[in-house]
């Protein structure tokens, strides 16, 4: 910041958003970071990890029943906007800013649903899944660009490297808290491959 003199700074994080910074057993998240920084020092924090559509119902309180396609007000802490587009590509987050006289102002924010559907039941009793918002068509140019990489990865994943008759435990509630046979197998493979004396991995970095 001192050498480059950027007009804006946007932080991309994976720390989680917790109402009013009440992170419980989790590590401190985006709210705590924004409060710890100089006021307005970031234009925006684009977060992840807690897998929330960060749309505020009131100050320091997220909307827990957000409906796709409806207005979404992002959080703001210490003059810093905090946004998060839920999980798994369900939304594209869009923030429009105006930059005038050295000042940034957010003029619009929305979560754009990516072909999300809801279940509706008609008068005849039949049920159907329908789109919340108009369908977003696939971009054929992008598919052509990315398909070779996807196919290459798929071919590598289909190579058989071993087999087991037992279950490799990868349940989130297990791998986050205790050692599992899957974790030990992965670490043993890493040690064998590299000739290391020991191996360490994050609890739950690889899971079901």
Feature-to-residue mapping (PLM):
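A glycine-rich phosphate-binding loop feature that marks nucleotide/adenosyl-phosphate handling sites
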Residues: 111-114, 163-172, 202-208
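Active-site-adjacent helix-turn-beta-strand microarchitecture at beta-sheet edges
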Residues: 25-158
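Active-site metal-binding loops of divalent metal-dependent hydrolases
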Residues: 13-16, 48-50, 86-87, 203-205
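Active-site catalytic microenvironments in core metabolic enzymes, especially phosphate/sugar-handling
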Residues: 180-186, 205
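Glycine-rich phosphate/diphosphate-binding loops and the adjacent beta-loop-alpha structural elements
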Residues: 155-179
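Short acidic, glycine-rich surface-loop motifs adjacent to enzyme active sites
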Residues: 1-21
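Loop/turn elements at helix/coil->beta-strand transitions in domains of secreted/extracellular proteins
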Residues: 3-9, 40-43, 78-80, 195-198
């Amino acid at each position: 910041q001192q050498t480059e003199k950027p007009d804006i700074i946007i932080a991309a994080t994976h720390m989680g958003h917790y109402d009013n910074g009440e992170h419980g057993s989790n590590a401190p998240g985006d709210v705590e970071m924004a409060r710890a920084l100089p006021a307005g020092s970031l234009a925006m924090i684009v977060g992840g990890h807690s897998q929330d559509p960060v749309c505020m119902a009131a100050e320091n309180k997220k909307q827990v029943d957000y409906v796709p396609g409806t207005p979404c007000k992002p959080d703001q802490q210490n003059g810093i906007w905090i946004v998060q587009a839920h999980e798994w590509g369900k939304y594209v987050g869009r923030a429009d800013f105006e930059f005038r006289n050295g000042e940034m102002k957010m003029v619009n924010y929305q979560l754009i649903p990516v072909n999300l559907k809801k279940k509706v039941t008609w008068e005849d009793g039949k049920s159907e899944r329908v789109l919340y918002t108009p369908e977003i068509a696939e971009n054929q140019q992008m598919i052509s660009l990315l398909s070779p990489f996807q196919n290459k990865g798929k071919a590598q994943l289909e190579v058989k490297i071993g087999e087991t008759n037992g279950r490799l435990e990868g349940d989130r509630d297990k791998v986050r808290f205790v050692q599992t046979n899957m974790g030990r197998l992965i670490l043993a493979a890493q040690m064998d491959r590299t000739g290391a004396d020991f191996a360490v991995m994050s609890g739950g970095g690889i899971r079901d």
